[in-house]
């Protein structure tokens, strides 16, 4: 009887453990920047208030591999970020000092990749 009890105890201890849930893969979100009410039209972009802090914020997101791509087009900026959900993507946006101070306004939209392999929600491989 003792061997059976020991075997059952081992089954309970090791055999019936629930596997660790795997986190959901990140999704992509497009953040579209445009000038805000605090944008000074008399100054060039590099001399705007909070531009240095804006660049530092984007640099930190790049270092954390949260940015999939980014650039400017016309009078707009576009940054595609990796996030678990829309709330996390919005939090990244709201953490930007230039947005918080009204130098930029921005919108967040879910990003749908059409051509697979061109942009990935997964972080790039280590260098």
What residue spans do the PLM features occupy?
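Bacterial Sec-dependent signal peptides at the C-terminal "C-region" and cleavage site
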Residues: 3-23
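Conserved, structured core segments of small domains
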Residues: 18-127
